[in-house]
């Protein structure tokens, strides 16, 4: 996969998560988890773009580590949404798969 393809995928991932969070029923739980999910999911693409501009191999590795952490954190928040009954598993299935692929 090329850099540009991965940039597109991470951007699409962020946009899909934004749509998911906007569609959640309003409650204190979804507000808190939704905010955390938005932060981590949008950070995946932002940090990948930063990694592409890294000035050294060490900088690239460091930023890619952040990308991995944020993708994994996004999975955690989506799993919590399902486990807490805030959204059905089917609603996040594709997003979880994409986050897992981005981690690979």
Sequence positions of predicted segments:
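Amphipathic alpha-helical assembly/interaction segments
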Residues: 1-104
């Amino acid at each position: 996969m090329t850099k540009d393809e991965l940039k597109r995928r991470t951007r699409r991932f962020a946009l899909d998560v934004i749509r998911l969070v906007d569609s959640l029923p309003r409650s204190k739980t979804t507000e808190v988890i939704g905010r955390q999910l938005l932060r981590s999911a949008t950070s995946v693409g932002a940090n990948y773009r930063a990694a592409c501009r890294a000035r050294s191999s060490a900088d690239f590795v460091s930023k890619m580590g952040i990308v991995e952490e944020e993708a994994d954190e996004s999975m955690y928040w989506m799993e919590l949404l399902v486990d807490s009954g805030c959204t059905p598993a089917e609603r996040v299935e594709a997003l979880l798969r994409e986050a897992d692929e981005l981690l690979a």
